[in-house]
């Protein structure tokens, strides 16, 4: 174990005690409040004389499987690019998502499906919980390698609550449409993580600079995450949209947007790369921006051409962000964004929200016909004009940025509590701080980790 005996003793107790407390408290709350909904409960379902073929499970579960794979495989492997942080990237993704999906079931349940004193859960609850876990993992990407697992669990504890409140305000109070989460998931998760990273700024992080890069095999493993995310992203955006034409259209728009963002990424990467060569960081990340940018508008009548245009724009903007804006973010704004979530989720998320404003403002009864009610119910009912819906969409973006910024600031203050274990500057981005790494003898391979230097900690 790297570090002093007192640090090792604290690490031995801190994570187990926190995991036991959080799981125990969650289990008690589940026992008191959580019940099956009428589509899951044996007695209620059969009492209603429905055919099993009508159960929502058969319509939603295939999408849930894809979303689940994205959260646990896609996000986990996308972050293994760091040469000595693969165990932590995949392992802490596993830990955070497993806790976040339980906690978000409770938080979202109290806000969305609390009836008769109970939270009623089904397959839609599982999808919503995974969406929330995705936002937490986006924030994790901004502080990857600089925080301990106990800090990350506390981050998730706070972020899930704020995610649920922000989502409730946007979807239920403002009537915002955001099927694929450009605002509620990507923008919120990115800027929560970026503000958190700013509060946890480490001026002496250069001591771990030699571990911040990738090696050939770590980039190859990260591409596994990229491919999983790329393939399943149409399901992610379409998972909770209206069955039928709405879900079909959402998947189609996402499909074309991802394809265009990939070509845009390859084009810009070669254009701005050294000697015209491609940068694997760009390909791993910016190629996915097409899925983010149509998150809000994918269920709308965006048109295939609109999806291609939005995807290409997102891929180019994301690539330029990785090449030029990411260094400025650290040097000028003191935001140490490990995974570049600002370029993959932040900027494309904001662009996606603005695209939603535009497409909502163009909505007409002629274009949507009877389908207007499933996409823009308030417009269909005459309670709101298309212009008013567009303004509500824009206001939803500002609300999301406010919740994310305030939440990230509060989270940073929470994670800076002195008793929380975090790696010193000289030991960041290193698996051996928290993991037993097979095939390596610490005394020989990681002797520098035993040196306690005077430096900052998160």
UniProtKB/Swiss-Prot annotation:
TM regions (residue ranges):
14-34, 62-82, 87-107, 125-145, 150-170, 179-201, 220-240, 252-272, 283-303, 305-325, 347-367, 394-414
Q: Which residues lie on this side of the membrane: Cytoplasmic?
A: 1-13, 83-86, 146-149, 202-219, 273-282, 326-346, 415-458
Instruction: Write out the PTM section of this UniProt entry.
Output: N-glycosylated.
* Single Gene Ontology BP annotation: ammonium homeostasis
Motif Basolateral sorting signal location, chain numbering: 429-432
Q: Where is the signal peptide?
A: none
Per the record, which residues fall in region Interaction with ANK3?
A: 416-424
Per UniProt, the keywords (alphabetical) are: Ammonia transport, Cell membrane, Glycoprotein, Membrane, Transmembrane, Transmembrane helix, Transport
Q: What is this protein's function? A: Ammonium transporter involved in the maintenance of acid-base homeostasis. Transports ammonium and its related derivative methylammonium across the basolateral plasma membrane of epithelial cells likely contributing to renal transepithelial ammonia transport and ammonia metabolism. May transport either NH4(+) or NH3 ammonia species predominantly mediating an electrogenic NH4(+) transport. May act as a CO2 channel providing for renal acid secretion.
Record protein name field: Ammonium transporter Rh type B
Q: Which organism is it from?
A: Pan troglodytes (Chimpanzee)
Starting at the broadest rank, the lineage of the source organism is: Eukaryota, Metazoa, Chordata, Craniata, Vertebrata
Q: Which gene encodes it?
A: RHBG
């Amino acid at each position: 174990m790297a570090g002093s005996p007192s640090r090792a003793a604290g690490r031995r107790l801190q994570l187990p005690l926190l995991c036991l407390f959080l799981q125990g408290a969650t289990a008690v709350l589940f026992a008191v409040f959580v019940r099956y909904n009428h589509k899951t409960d044996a007695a209620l379902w059969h009492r209603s004389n429905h055919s099993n073929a009508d159960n929502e499970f058969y319509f939603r579960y295939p999408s849930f499987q894809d979303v689940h794979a994205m959260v646990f495989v896609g996000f986990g492997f996308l972050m293994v690019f760091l040469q000595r942080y693969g165990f932590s990237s995949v392992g802490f993704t596993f830990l955070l998502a497993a806790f976040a999906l339980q906690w978000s079931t409770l938080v979202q349940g109290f806000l969305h499906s609390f009836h008769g004193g109970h939270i009623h859960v089904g397959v839609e609850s599982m999808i919503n919980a995974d969406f929330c876990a995705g936002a937490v993992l986006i924030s994790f990407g901004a502080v990857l390698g600089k925080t301990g697992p106990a800090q990350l669990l506390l981050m998730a504890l706070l972020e899930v609550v704020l995610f649920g409140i922000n989502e409730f305000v946007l979807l239920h109070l403002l009537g915002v449409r955001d099927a694929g989460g450009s605002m509620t998931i990507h923008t919120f998760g990115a800027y929560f993580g970026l503000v958190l990273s700013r509060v946890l700024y480490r001026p002496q992080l250069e001591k771990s600079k030699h571990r911040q890069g990738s090696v050939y095999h770590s980039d190859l493993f990260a591409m596994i995450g990229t491919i999983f995310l790329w393939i399943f992203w149409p399901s992610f955006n379409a998972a909770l949209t209206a069955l039928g034409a709405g879900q079909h259209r959402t998947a189609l728009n996402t499909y074309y947007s991802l394809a265009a963002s990939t070509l845009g990424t390859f084009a810009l990467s070669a254009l701005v790369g050294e000697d015209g060569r491609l940068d694997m960081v760009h390909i791993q990340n910016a190629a996915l921006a097409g899925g983010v940018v149509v998150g809000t508008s994918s269920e709308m009548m965006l048109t295939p051409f609109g999806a291609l245009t939005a995807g290409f724009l997102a891929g180019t903007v994301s690539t330029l962000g990785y090449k030029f804006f990411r260094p400025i973010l650290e040097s000028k704004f003191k935001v140490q964004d490990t995974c570049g979530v600002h370029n993959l989720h932040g900027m494309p998320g904001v662009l996606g929200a603005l695209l939603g404003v535009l497409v909502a403002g163009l909505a007409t009864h002629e274009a949507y016909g009877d389908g207007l009610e499933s996409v823009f119910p308030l417009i269909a009912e005459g309670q709101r004009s298309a212009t008013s819906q567009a303004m509500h969409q824009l206001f939803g973006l500002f609300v999301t940025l406010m919740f994310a910024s305030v939440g990230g600031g509060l989270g940073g203050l929470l994670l800076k509590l002195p008793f929380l274990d975090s790696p010193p500057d000289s030991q960041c981005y290193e698996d051996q701080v928290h993991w037993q790494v097979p095939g390596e003898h610490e005394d020989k391979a990681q002797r520098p980790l035993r040196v306690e230097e005077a430096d900052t900690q998160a």
